[in-house]
Amino acid sequence: PYGPRPVEEILLFTEQMIDRLLESDVKAVVLACNTITVNCLPALQQKYMIPIIGMNLAAEAVNQLSEKRSVAILGTAATIAAGKHLEALQGVDTDLRAYPIPCYDFAALVEAGHIGDSQAMSAVSQYLGDVRGEVDVVVLGCTHYPFLAKDIEVFMGDTATIIDPRYCGSSQKP
């Protein structure tokens, strides 16, 4: 997972991957990672002469679905620190209350296979405990997090809609 890594290292790794892809004469690159999208997309688009497409930050979906005008944004530490989800949401509705929550171990839990178990539920309650009942939308700001969507749904009950940005399309700008 890239979330705990410094932005410079994330950019370096991503450039190495793109350089490798260019050896195969690719015509475009889709960044299927929120951390890379929010931290590196403009630099990558400037460096490479092919289309570089990032993840959608789901601001329009939140705007349409949130009746309380209150949303939790779950992401890696690097994704939350970049502030791009918050910026995108405030660009759509300045009255929206957003709770950016860095979920330090979600990606590692998923990679270790802790889905639907007590460790997953413990982590979900740790990160979402303070906003349960406050928010009516939860944005999954990392491509690992949909694996924990059922755990999040169980914890939040029917009080919140889960938005998986994989289904919101892609974005040219973070």
Language-model features and meaning:
Residues P1-P174:
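Non-catalytic structural scaffold of enzyme domains
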